[in-house]
């Protein structure tokens, strides 16, 4: 039996999520396997972040992707969870609006805000 076809809508307007509370922007530096990644966060720290199962089953995260990181309550400067991965279109929008800098994406200086 063929799979049910999904209806594809035209250009949908979706709000770009921004970090809230103690969440941070981060760039994936290295994939470690078993759902773990090293992420360089906007505060200059490199955190070992886990991809929760809810996100792991839906989104493929690669080295160089811009993500939102939620630091853990314990070991907040060393560990965290990846909450969201931005698409390239969303990254371009964040650059245009001044939320992040090109240097942050390429490994240089930190964010503007």
Swiss-Prot record:
Disulfide bonds: none
Pfam families cross-referenced by the UniProt entry: eIF-1a
Alphabetically ordered keywords of this record: Initiation factor, Protein biosynthesis
MF annotations from Gene Ontology: RNA binding; translation initiation factor activity
Residue stretches making up the S1-like domain: 12-87
Gene3D superfamilies in alphabetical order: Nucleic acid-binding proteins (2.40.50.140)
PROSITE patterns xref list: IF1A (PS01262), S1_IF1_TYPE (PS50832)
HAMAP family: aIF_1A (MF_00216)
Protein role: Seems to be required for maximal rate of protein biosynthesis. Enhances ribosome dissociation into subunits and stabilizes the binding of the initiator Met-tRNA(I) to 40 S ribosomal subunits.
Family the UniProt entry places it in: Belongs to the eIF-1A family.
Matching PANTHER family: EIF-1A (PTHR21668)
NCBIfam families reported in the protein's UniProt record: eIF-1A, PRK04012.1-3, PRK04012.1-5, PRK04012.2-2
Name of the protein in its database record: Translation initiation factor 1A
Species this chain originates from: Pyrococcus abyssi (strain GE5 / Orsay)
């Amino acid at each position: 039996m063929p799979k049910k076809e999904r209806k594809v809508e035209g250009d949908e307007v979706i709000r770009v999520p921004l970090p809230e509370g103690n969440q941070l922007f981060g760039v994936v530096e290295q994939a470690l396997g078993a759902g773990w990644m090293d992420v360089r966060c906007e505060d200059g720290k490199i955190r070992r972040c886990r991809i929760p199962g809810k996100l792991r089953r839906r989104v493929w995260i690669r080295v160089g992707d811009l993500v939102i990181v939620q630091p853990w309550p314990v070991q907040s400067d060393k560990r965290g969870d990846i909450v969201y991965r931005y698409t390239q279109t969303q990254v371009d929008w964040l650059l245009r609006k001044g939320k992040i800098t090109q240097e942050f994406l390429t490994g240089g200086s930190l964010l503007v805000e």
